[in-house]
């Protein structure tokens, strides 16, 4: 039976045919083995931290199994959310309800009936008991989406729950670190810590090579290497690009991945991503007040202010998700075409614009928080955003 490309390359679901196990550097210990060990340690909470789009949730699904994993998101919680009501609802337990009791009295000719309604709330002990009896593992994904106050409330609930042997995994990003978990004195000695590294190019190449082999599509090692560089350490992005390649090859009735198809596939892939507003917001910067912004002529003839230069610097080759300030500043200088007697912008000016841009993005919805300026480095928190920046803009 011929297998379809969408069954092989699955960007948003468990990749049965293209799952790649990864190992701690210089060891034969896989992430799967480490997670199994953590889950078998009674009374401990598992904390998984790693960059966005790195397969943290897929790792959990691989080890736990789709039938046993119960996923909730930090975004599910606000200050009015009942934690245990949410946990119960995910497994369809009736957390609150009413019980009607009826009483009958009968005489020779008449039967009387009366009754009363009683409200109940399921105890957390019963919820924990259900999870344990049914071998369920609670995975709180995107823990950083919850407010710091809510994170602390959840941490307090989990402290007692893990003592009762509820299995819980908390998943978060490294630069929005779950301090409520990892820095919580009440959880000291009760944590299994797992830090997920970014993907190496050799592991990303395996996704392409395995998948295309399954589909009987030819691809050279050199092409797979180019794909691995462009997918910016993200296995999810690799799945997206490979699926786009398959769609284009099928349309052209071809069975080989060539250099010519790559750029077309990159641009085709960005149709899936909605970052246009994010890019526009970054390029415009904060609302302008007072004097006009200084404009710089670029080597390709554009006129950009510092916010525009920041955006273009992110898009330059080679694609990087972590950029030191010196490298970032160098990229900006390379973009500017200086006229006579004109000087390059001071480093302090660039840093000030990065700080203001950071404040602007932090005040907006989560999708806008694609980059972070912290500790002298620019971090790209979302590889899909950077990929869009490089290939999705009409004038990019």
Regions found by a protein language model. Give the residues of each.
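A short hydrophobic beta-strand->loop->alpha-helix junction that borders the nucleotide-binding pocket
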Residues: 49-50, 70-80, 173
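Walker A/P-loop nucleotide-binding motif
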Residues: 39-61, 76
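Conserved NTP-binding/hydrolysis module of P-loop NTPases
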Residues: 68-69, 78-109
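C-terminal leucine-rich, beta-strand-based interaction scaffolds used for sensing/assembly
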Residues: 260-396
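Amphipathic alpha-helical "lid/sensor" segments that cap RecA-like P-loop NTPase cores
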Residues: 221-279, 396
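Conserved small helical "lid"/interfacial subdomain of P-loop NTPases
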Residues: 196-224, 233-241
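A short, basic N-terminal segment
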Residues: 1-46
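Mid-core helix/loop region of P-loop NTP-binding domains shared across ATPases and GTPases
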Residues: 94-140, 144-167, 173-186, 197-203, ...
């Amino acid at each position: 039976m011929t297998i379809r490309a969408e069954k092989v390359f699955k960007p948003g679901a468990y990749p049965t045919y293209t799952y790649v196990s990864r190992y701690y550097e210089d060891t034969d210990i896989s992430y799967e083995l480490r997670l199994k060990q953590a889950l078998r340690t009674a009374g401990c909470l598992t904390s998984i931290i790693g960059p966005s789009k790195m397969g943290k949730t897929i790792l959990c699904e691989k080890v736990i199994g789709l039938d046993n994993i119960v996923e909730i998101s930090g975004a599910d919680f606000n200050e009015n959310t009942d934690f245990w009501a949410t946990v119960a609802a995910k497994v369809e337990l009736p957390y609150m309800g009413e019980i009607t009791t009826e009483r009958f009295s009968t005489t020779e000719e008449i039967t009387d009936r009366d009754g009363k309604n009683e409200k109940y709330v399921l105890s957390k002990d019963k919820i924990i008991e259900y999870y344990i009896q049914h071998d369920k593992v609670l995975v709180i994904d995107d823990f950083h989406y919850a407010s710091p106050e809510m994170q602390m409330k959840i941490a307090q609930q989990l402290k007692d729950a893990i003592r009762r042997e509820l299995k819980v995994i908390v998943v978060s990003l490294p630069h929005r670190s779950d301090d409520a978990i990892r820095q919580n004195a009440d959880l000291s000695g009760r944590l299994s810590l797992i830090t997920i590294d970014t993907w190496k190019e050799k592991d990303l190449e395996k996704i392409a090579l395995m998948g295309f082999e399954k589909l009987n599509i030819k691809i050279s090692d050199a092409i797979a290497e180019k794909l691995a560089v462009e997918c910016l350490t993200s296995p999810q992005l690799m799945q997206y690009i490979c699926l786009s390649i398959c769609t284009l090859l099928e349309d052209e009735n071809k069975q080989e991945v060539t250099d010519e198809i790559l750029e077309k596939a990159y641009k085709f892939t960005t149709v899936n991503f909605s970052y246009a507003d994010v890019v526009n917001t970054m390029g415009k910067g904060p609302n302008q007040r007072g004097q006009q912004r200084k404009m710089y002529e670029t080597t390709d003839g554009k006129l950009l202010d510092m916010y525009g230069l920041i955006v273009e610097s992110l898009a330059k080759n080679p694609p990087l998700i972590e950029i030191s300030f010196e490298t970032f500043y160098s990229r900006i200088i390379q973009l500017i075409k200086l006229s006579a007697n004109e000087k390059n912008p001071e480093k302090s000016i660039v840093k000030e614009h990065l700080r203001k841009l950071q404040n602007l993005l932090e005040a907006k919805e989560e999708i806008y928080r694609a980059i972070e300026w912290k500790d002298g480095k620019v971090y790209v928190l979302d590889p899909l955003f950077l990929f869009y920046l490089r290939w999705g803009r009409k004038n990019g």
